[in-house]
């Protein structure tokens, strides 16, 4: 009973990733570690957002530097601890930085494009979209040949999020093409249920 209560309290407080017992040994849905990392980030977000508005490049580089230091300086040199280290908040700061940068670039560019639209912009973005898809495919295939999958995942997390950022920005500015791909009813439906689907898929699959 004590272990179950500890497991439950850690999950409800979004602190389960801090202990091997409640993270690696949890009897609750294992994918809920993502909610813990996100909630920890939300605690920092008001400060980071304020810094990003004032000094976007410095804030981005600071988040990226902290994340890469944790990945390459702390985690990857300790392969025996990777399962515990790979999904801690510092490892994701670079991913969150890309998301904040994407929002910043989109907001800034949208205002300028509204004032001075570039009609041929979607045509220029099509090669960017194609290139991004090629990179995503290469990263996906690289995982199959990785000697240590957690190490590969940690090393590729920032490049992968960078490719996704590039792809989403390109699609967002690709006019009717982007709206057809991202704004249709089917994708809007899956967008609405995507996180719930992610939370339940492993729990159902392993049973």
Task: Please place each PLM-identified region on the residue numbering.
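Extracytosolic (periplasmic/ER-lumenal) interhelical loops and adjacent juxtamembrane/interface segments
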Residues: 4-23
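Alpha-helical membrane-protein architecture signal
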Residues: 5, 25-29, 94, 183
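Hydrophobic transmembrane-helix microenvironments that flank and shape a buried ionizable site
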Residues: 8, 13, 34-37, 89-92, ...
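Alpha-helical transmembrane segments
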Residues: 11, 60-68, 124-129
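Membrane-interface helix caps and helix-loop-helix hairpins in membrane proteins
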Residues: 24-28, 77-86, 147-151
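Specific transmembrane alpha-helix
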Residues: 34-50, 63-114, 131-132, 156-179
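Membrane-interfacial entry segments at the cytosolic side of transmembrane helices
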Residues: 54-62, 111-124
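Alpha-helical transmembrane segments of multi-pass integral membrane proteins
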Residues: 92, 96, 100, 121-207
């Amino acid at each position: 009973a004590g272990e179950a209560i500890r497991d439950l309290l850690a999950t409800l407080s979004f602190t389960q990733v801090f202990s091997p017992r409640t993270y690696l040994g949890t009897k609750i849905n294992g994918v809920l570690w993502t909610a813990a990392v996100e909630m920890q980030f939300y605690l920092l977000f008001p400060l980071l957002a304020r810094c990003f508005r004032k000094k976007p490049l410095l804030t981005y580089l600071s988040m990226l530097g902290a994340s890469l230091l944790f990945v390459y300086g702390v985690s990857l040199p300790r392969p025996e601890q990777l399962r515990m280290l790979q999904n801690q908040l510092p490892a994701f700061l670079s991913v969150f930085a890309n998301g904040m940068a994407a929002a910043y670039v989109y907001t800034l560019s949208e205002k300028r494009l509204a004032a001075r639209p570039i009609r041929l912009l979607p045509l220029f973005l099509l090669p960017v979209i194609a290139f991004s898809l090629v990179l995503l495919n290469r990263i996906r295939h690289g995982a199959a040949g990785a000697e240590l999958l957690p190490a590969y995942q940690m090393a590729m997390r920032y490049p992968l999020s960078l490719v996704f950022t590039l792809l989403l920005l390109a699609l967002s500015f690709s006019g009717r093409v982007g709206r057809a791909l991202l704004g249709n009813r089917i994708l809007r439906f899956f967008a609405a249920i995507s996180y719930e689907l992610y939370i339940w898929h492993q729990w159902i699959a392993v049973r």
